[in-house]
């Protein structure tokens, strides 16, 4: 009930300033006493347990990557009731990302455009935060490549991050679908994807022996695929026996927001305008994968109805981020109560 008032204050700030403030506040909410108070205030139920990728999730609702890039606010977000939190995207080296301003609201469509460019403090910083977290759910770590790394050497960055994150992650996500790192999406196709996933699976097998535990690896894909590209991606994921696929990242399309303020800003569009596009990708992926690889649905979830649509389409877990900005933590509670 309070969130519409809070949102007015948040939306009076520039989007990135509002985000940074929220992260600082949620970092403070990691304090054990404040964390208990926040949990009591939000009163989110524990939800329905679900086992996916061999992991037991206390409920199927997660926080999407991009919200807590450096793992600074894991316990604060955890108090909202999430079953899992995906931190990152993180790269081997710290990097500033693209020039500001780089986040823009499309308020009338409940959308957000970002061209952040994987701004983060580096994988070592993030891993230290993951190690300190008290969150009782699953923590996923989303990994990417540095902007300065040539695409043809991109797999080196993913392997570097995999080595660093493996022992501390509930699962790891390979992000090859952000539109804001030049050339990154090339890694989704053909021999480039084949080569990358082969290297990642080999390293996963090695690390599983070293640490005596198997940490599942998912791949996050874009929504802007042709039919042929999607079929090819699904086939490659299946051949390499990937543990999961996240559908989807942000879109470069502006079909759903044409003519609106900030619609012409360069970057990836998320939120409600992505809702149907991401659900359709989930549906098509499910048809191709036939349940062999679990799908994590992400993109425009802002209520129980469209969350259910993604489950019906084939998603086993769900992630939210933009919907949280527009609707507040009450969204998490509603989804946790409703989604099985």
UniProtKB/Swiss-Prot annotation:
Chain residues that bind substrate: 69, 114-118, 175, 180, 249-250
GO BP annotation list: 'de novo' pyrimidine nucleobase biosynthetic process; 'de novo' UMP biosynthetic process
Q: What is its main location?
A: membrane
Which CDD domains does this one have?
A: DHOD_2_like
Compartmental location = Cell membrane
Keyword entries, A-Z: Cell membrane, Flavoprotein, FMN, Membrane, Oxidoreductase, Pyrimidine biosynthesis
Pathway(s) served: Pyrimidine metabolism; UMP biosynthesis via de novo pathway; orotate from (S)-dihydroorotate (quinone route): step 1/1
| UniProt-recorded Gene Ontology molecular function terms | dihydroorotate dehydrogenase (quinone) activity
Q: Signal peptide span per the entry?
A: none
Question: Catalytic site residues?
Answer: 178 (nucleophile)
Residues where FMN binds: 65-69, 89, 142, 175, 220, 248, 271, 300, 321-322
User: Which protein family is it in?
Assistant: Belongs to the dihydroorotate dehydrogenase family. Type 2 subfamily.
Q: What is this protein called?
A: Dihydroorotate dehydrogenase (quinone)
């Amino acid at each position: 009930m309070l969130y519409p008032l809070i949102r007015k204050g948040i939306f009076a700030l520039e989007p990135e300033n509002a985000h940074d403030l929220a992260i600082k506040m949620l970092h403070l909410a990691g304090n054990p006493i404040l964390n208990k108070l926040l949990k009591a205030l939000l009163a989110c139920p524990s939800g329905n347990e679900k086992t996916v990728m061999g992991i037991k999730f206390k409920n199927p609702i997660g926080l999407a990557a991009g919200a807590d890039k450096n793992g600074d606010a894991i316990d604060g977000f955890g108090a909202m009731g999430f079953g899992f939190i995906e931190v990152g995207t993180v790269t081997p080296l710290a990097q500033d990302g693209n020039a500001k301003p780089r986040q823009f609201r499309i308020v009338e469509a409940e959308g957000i455009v970002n061209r952040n460019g994987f701004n983060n403090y580096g994988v070592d910083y993030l891993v230290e935060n993951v190690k300190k977290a008290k969150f009782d759910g699953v923590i996923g770590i989303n990994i990417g490549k540095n902007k300065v790394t040539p695409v043809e050497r991109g797999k080196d960055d993913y392997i570097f991050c995999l080595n660093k994150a493996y022992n501390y992650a509930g699962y790891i996500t390979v992000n090859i679908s952000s539109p804001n790192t030049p050339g990154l999406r090339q890694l989704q196709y053909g021999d480039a994807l084949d080569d990358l996933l082969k290297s990642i699976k080999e390293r996963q097998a090695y690390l599983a022996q070293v640490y005596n535990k198997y940490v599942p690896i998912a791949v996050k894909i874009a929504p802007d695929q042709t039919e042929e590209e999607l079929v090819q991606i699904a086939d490659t994921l299946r051949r390499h026996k990937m543990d999961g696929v996240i559908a989807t990242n942000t879109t470069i399309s502006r079909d759903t927001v044409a003519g609106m303020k900030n619609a012409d800003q360069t970057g990836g569009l998320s939120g409600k305008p992505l809702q149907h596009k991401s659900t359709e990708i989930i549906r098509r992926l499910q048809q191709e994968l036939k349940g062999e690889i679990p799908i994590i649905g992400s993109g425009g979830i802002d209520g129980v109805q469209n969350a259910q649509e993604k489950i019906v389409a084939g998603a086993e877990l769900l992630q939210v981020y933009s919907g949280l900005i527009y609707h507040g933590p009450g969204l998490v509670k509603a989804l946790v109560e409703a989604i099985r």
